[in-house]
Amino acid sequence: MKQTKTKYGKMKQMVSNLKLPDYRYEQLTKAIFHQRIDNFDDIHILPKALRMSLVNEFGKNVSSVIPVFSQDSKQAQKLLFELTDGERIEAVGLKYKQGWESFCISSQCGCGFGCRFCATGSAGFKRNLTADEITDQLLYFYFNNHRLNSISFMGMGEAFANPELFDAVKILTDQNLFGLSQRRITISTIGIIPGIQRLTKKFPQVNLAFSLHSPFESRRSDLMPINKRFPLNEVMKTLDEHIIHTGRRVFIAYIMLEGINDSKEHAEAVVGLLKNRGSWEHLYHIDLIPYNSTDKTTFKFQSSSAIKQFCSTLKKAGISATVRTQFGSEISAACGQLCYENEL
């Protein structure tokens, strides 16, 4: 990665170009990440010439994303952000009873993969986000006194389809910037094999979540067209390699769709998919997700009793499985519901 690709690289280069000592960059990053100062002009410890250069290059504020709409529920907040070119994305903040805060961020404007159960795909793909636009979503929450306890790339878009993803993760894990542990970050994928392989090599401690949704190749291809490009069998082999290399658990997301993928046959096929893979198979964990309805899709919500029965079948076969506790569905902030349709 070139040093000047992200704004933090540009800031460092700016300090050098102005022939200022290196500690000025350290003062700048400490003002942002320790003192939570979002306005360059308010970083009074910096020389005026540097502050003026920062404003000229990046604008008045450190964060480039502008909140234009917010919806709150008891434990969730959904933000609609406008970017500098007018495009819009959504991000979600979640609060748990223990005080833990988790954030679901977007990696793309829209999504071009067309998963049939996901509202984001109905909008189509607009463009990839830059590494700064990805991390600025979190910077906004941070500047508003939230604690960045955990981060998930489960918002709009397929993270591994965006080349900027790994620059964003580098920013998030840089101890002089966000300083997050890799283990506090989760990347969700529909099964982009090259992306999984790159994550294994570059950030082996980052959590990986794979969207399965059907154990049958043909049915999965119908629900998720990406399966024709990266077949389930090949993805599973790549996930095996990831576990062997990292020793880390892989989470497998499975949205429960009534009459589509919720039968005993499906549950037994999931068992067959995960059993007898090797000594590492215990590191696969199934995350059953109740379907969240939207006006963009036509699937039906599965009853909680049916989901529990599906989960029971998995557990009896020795598969690690849980039913996800969902927050934010009442404000269209849950899994599969983000579609940036709200406006002031």
From Swiss-Prot:
Recorded catalytic activity of this chain's protein: adenosine(2503) in 23S rRNA + 2 reduced [2Fe-2S]-[ferredoxin] + 2 S-adenosyl-L-methionine = 8-methyladenosine(2503) in 23S rRNA + 5'-deoxyadenosine + L-methionine + 2 oxidized [2Fe-2S]-[ferredoxin] + S-adenosyl-L-homocysteine
Remarks, miscellaneous: Reaction proceeds by a ping-pong mechanism involving intermediate methylation of a conserved cysteine residue.
The organism encoding this protein is Clostridium botulinum (strain Okra / Type B1)
Keywords, in A-Z order: 4Fe-4S, Antibiotic resistance, Cytoplasm, Disulfide bond, Iron, Iron-sulfur, Metal-binding, Methyltransferase, rRNA processing, S-adenosyl-L-methionine, Transferase
Which cellular component terms (GO) are annotated to the entry?
cytoplasm
Q: Which InterPro entries match?
A: Aldolase_TIM (IPR013785), Methyltransferase_A (IPR040072), rRNA_lsu_MeTfrase_Cfr (IPR022881), rRNA_lsu_MTrfase_RlmN/Cfr (IPR004383), rSAM (IPR007197)
Biological role stated in the UniProt entry = Specifically methylates position 8 of adenine 2503 in 23S rRNA. Confers resistance to some classes of antibiotics.
> What is this protein's record name?
Ribosomal RNA large subunit methyltransferase Cfr
- Per its UniProt entry, what is the enzyme's top EC class, as one word? transferase
User: Superkingdom, according to UniProt?
Assistant: Bacteria
User: E.C. number, please?
Assistant: 2.1.1.224
What does this protein need as cofactor? [4Fe-4S] cluster
